[in-house]
Amino acid sequence: MSSDAVDETHENARQEVIAVDADDNEEGLVNRLDAHTGDGVRHRAFTALLFDENDRILLAQRAANKRLWDTHWDGTVASHPVEGQTQVEATEERLEEELGVDPSQYQNLRVTDRFEYKRYYENAGLEWEVCAVLQATLHDTSLEPNPEEVDGLMWVPYERLREHPEYYRQLRLCPWFEIAMRRDEER
């Protein structure tokens, strides 16, 4: 399905993402809506996991206006870098846009993993991403969430969540976050 067959007024119809092969090598740009509808197009993405000094992870509830996985709970932020932008630069930008968190509030933002996945969401579309995982520790937990992006925030003991995800099923976790958490060897 092309973006012509989807609501072209949606903001995603005016954005591009980076199409990649299975090894995360760039293959060009693709319309963001096309990448997330029909059979989709594999593209570059990231999810960032921020922790406090007590090893709690900051989960963010995706806003109800999101096309995919609306109101689901995610790792701290997730998005797509734009052409010419590193994963770290893209993450710094999203942290500031979504949560009002600037680089002076955290340390050691780094890529810790990368994986490919493909998941469909209801009848709304899909994610087919090579997803980088970034992690950092917040030493200043002051937050100013953007209500257009985030409906809620929650600090959760990370090891408890990793070891007993069944305790948190009512949160409806985003699939990319669940994969990143299962694969996490950093903590």
Curated annotation (Swiss-Prot):
Primary enzyme class: isomerase
| Cofactor(s) for this UniProt protein | Mg(2+); Mn(2+)
The reaction(s) annotated as catalysed by this protein in its Swiss-Prot or TrEMBL entry are: isopentenyl diphosphate = dimethylallyl diphosphate
Which pathway does it operate in? Isoprenoid biosynthesis; dimethylallyl diphosphate biosynthesis; dimethylallyl diphosphate from isopentenyl diphosphate: step 1/1
Give the location in the cell.
Cytoplasm
Q: Does the keyword Cytoplasm apply?
A: yes
Q: Is Manganese among the key words of this record?
A: yes
Supply the EC number(s): 5.3.3.2
Q: Where does Mg(2+) bind?
A: 98
Q: Name one GO molecular function term.
A: metal ion binding
Q: Which residues form the active site?
A: 129
- Annotated PROSITE patterns: NUDIX
Domain Nudix hydrolase as annotated: residue spans:
41-178
Q: List keywords of the entry alphabetically.
A: Cytoplasm, Isomerase, Isoprene biosynthesis, Magnesium, Manganese, Metal-binding
Of the GO CC terms on this record, one is: cytoplasm
Q: What's noted on cofactor binding? A: Binds 1 Mg(2+) ion per subunit. The magnesium ion binds only when substrate is bound.
Annotated residues that bind Mn(2+) are located at 36, 43, 80, 127, 129
Could you mention a single GO BP entry for this protein?
dimethylallyl diphosphate biosynthetic process
Q: Which family does it belong to?
A: Belongs to the IPP isomerase type 1 family.
What is the annotated role of this protein in its UniProt record?
Answer: Catalyzes the 1,3-allylic rearrangement of the homoallylic substrate isopentenyl (IPP) to its highly electrophilic allylic isomer, dimethylallyl diphosphate (DMAPP).
Can you name this protein? Isopentenyl-diphosphate Delta-isomerase
Tell me what organism the protein belongs to: Haloarcula marismortui (strain ATCC 43049 / DSM 3752 / JCM 8966 / VKM B-1809)
